[in-house]
Swiss-Prot record:
Organism this protein belongs to: Rattus norvegicus (Rat)
EC number: 3.4.23.-
Family label: Belongs to the DDI1 family.
GO function term, MF aspect, one: aspartic-type endopeptidase activity
Bias (Polar residues): 96-109
Function: Probable aspartic protease. Seems to act as a proteasomal shuttle which links the proteasome and replication fork proteins like RTF2. Required, with DDI2, for cellular survival following replication stress. Together or redudantly with DDI2, removes RTF2 from stalled forks to allow cell cycle progression after replication stress and maintains genome integrity.
Gene that produces this protein: Ddi1
Positions of the UniProt region annotated as Disordered: 77-135, 386-408
Protein name (Swiss-Prot/TrEMBL): Protein DDI1 homolog 1
Active site: D266
Keywords: Aspartyl protease, Hydrolase, Protease
């Protein structure tokens, strides 16, 4: 038979779920099943049916008159003693995302019991008036304590899962939390709660305004659009979390004039470039033709000092002809652009994680993150460093030569 359980926890949060059990199922076992769903310890659970408290744990549910489709109420007892080891109070439902959406629950995955089948589960936060007379003075004080910044901070620091979610979805609050300053954390938390309250008030005003007013309709449309964006992001976090990670750029080992280098493979760049510092280390600055000087413009600008028309680059055991445009300032030593990749019919095989040299048939593996140059590693400042790399790559996509210089 299917029994619906309406649970009211000690902190006044509610949860409703359904259990598939047999009529001869004992009340003690039923409490355990409810604990798996609600998180309320079995010894603290009070089961009420038809305004009657069920007390005999050895009686079956059928003996109490329960039948298919009935509903029971589960009340959590007041805290009468120390909580068993390993149990923690339910976390407060605070806006930890900074955008009005709550972090998903942190309870562990539930395993189906042989006598139960989960049909649905829904959680919400009741107001004091919605507690159906179950809010005692202690419950109210406990609920207020759950909104304490100090308690929230200690809960987050003691729960690695919640902390990782906070870092991912609300970096500002996570930074304040990890600063170790309770006052800073409280200020950020209170400010975000205030902003959320203001958004809720604004939404109330929008939905209570004249529905035929054009300005109101435009604001409601924008709010719906933002909600769709937020929902799309939350779905992406659940279904494709890898899309929020940073991807290591494609680098290979090579040699120029006998000097080992790490080359950035960029099929989106028009030409192969080398930094001035790298050219000096490789002793090819003497070959730079300064008649090809100019400015590379794209996302940013870079000064082109000149061009080395012909040099050799060694990839694995192959020696390949290559030309380099020398840039005055850039973080990368060398960037292999489309001119070199096309000339040697190179192909990027991401499945095998190799660069295939079409003219020779040889291949070389892309470097793992640990072997990348410092400017390409995914560190705390990786976003800024990656932007610098992108700026250089974007600059050379549309090079602008100096006056009277022939394009190549």
């Amino acid at each position: 038979m299917l029994i619906t359980v309406y649970c009211v926890r000690r902190d006044l949060t509610e949860v409703t779920f359904s259990l598939q059990v047999n009529p001869d199922f004992e009340l003690s076992n039923f409490r355990v099943l409810c604990e798996l769903e609600s998180g309320v310890p079995a010894e603290e659970a009070q089961i009420v049916y038809m305004e009657q408290l069920l007390t005999d744990d050895h009686c079956s549910l059928g003996s109490y008159g329960l039948k298919d489709g009935d509903m029971v109420v589960l009340l959590q007892k007041d805290n009468v003693g120390p909580r068993p080891p390993g149990r923690a109070p339910n976390h407060p439902r605070t806006d930890f995302t900074g955008s009005g959406s709550a972090v998903p629950g942190t309870s562990s995955s539930r395993h189906p019991h042989p006598h139960q089948h989960h049909h649905h589960q829904h959680q919400r936060i009741p107001s004091t008036q919605q507690a159906h007379g179950l809010a005692s003075g202690e419950n109210m004080a406990f609920a207020q304590d759950l909104n304490s910044p100090a308690l929230i901070r200690s809960m987050l620091l003691s729960n690695p899962h919640d902390l990782s979610l906070l870092k991912e979805r609300n970096p500002a609050l996570a930074e304040a939390l990890l600063s170790g300053n309770l006052e800073t954390f409280s200020q950020v938390l209170v400010e975000q709660q205030r902003e959320r309250a203001m958004r809720e008030q604004e939404m109330f005003r929008l939905y209570s305004a004249d529905p035929f007013d054009q300005e109101t309709q435009a604001r409601i449309e924008e709010e719906i659009r933002q909600q769709n964006i937020e929902e799309n992001m939350n779905i992406a976090m659940e279904e494709a979390p890898e899309s929020f990670g940073q991807v290591a750029m494609l680098y290979i080992n090579c040699k120029v004039n006998g000097h080992p280098l790490k080359a950035f493979v960029d099929s989106g760049a028009q030409m192969t470039i080398m930094s001035q510092a790298c050219a000096e280390r490789c002793n090819i600055m003497r070959l730079v033709d300064r008649r090809w000087a100019g400015v590379a413009k794209g996302v940013g600008t870079q000064r082109i000092m000149g061009r080395v028309h012909l040099a050799q680059i060694q990839i694995e055991g192959d020696f390949l002809q290559c030309s380099f445009s020398i840039l005055e300032e850039q973080p990368m030593d060398i960037l292999l652009g489309l001119d070199m990749l096309r000339r040697h019919q190179c192909s990027i095989d991401l499945k095998k994680n190799v660069l295939v040299i079409g003219t020779t048939g040889s291949q070389t593996h892309f470097l793992p993150e640990g072997e990348l140059p410092l400017c390409a590693k995914l560190l705390s400042g990786a976003v800024q460093e990656d932007s610098s790399d992108k700026e250089v790559a974007g600059s050379i996509k549309h090079p602008v030569k100096g006056p009277g210089r022939k394009k190549h």
